[in-house]
């Protein structure tokens, strides 16, 4: 079940045992930082349908929010079984009218080019990895899986300790004992966060979306 930023912030405050020191705006900013960093390791896997017009082979991917990587392209969408097209440079002699696509401008928003000429009403199904959206209100759902929220909480905890550390550095204790303890805690908090990411990586299944299979020239069919 998707949970909201408000619910995540409540969890964070319980872990920090604090309802006063950091305003909501500060914790929200840390949540955004956590989502950006988490996307580097576990991007959001989602899909986008693109409506085609007659014989137009080029389409924008601007609706693919936070696009990082195109995983597969189905065209035309809706066939049973699904029909996937392969990526091939549009400069290839085989590209035009073939079951291919290319991404000549992969930088967001990006562009996708089909080898085949679509009909009006056809759709392109794009499965892609993208950044997790940054919530703009307390009631917007966090797209990170709930079982991965531990990493987000650890990231915010790390940032909270770092801020305490910086505050102590600006007004150091005469004995420097507090600063020393905070330094150790800050380093440990970062290690815990990185360790949690490695733990998730180790436990996540390797399985993912399957793209099209293309027979090698040496393969034989019996």
Give names to the regions the model predicted.
Residues 6, 47-48, 69, 86:
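Hydrophobic transmembrane signal anchors and adjacent membrane-proximal interface regions, especially
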Residues 48-64:
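Solvent-exposed, conformationally flexible loop/turn segments
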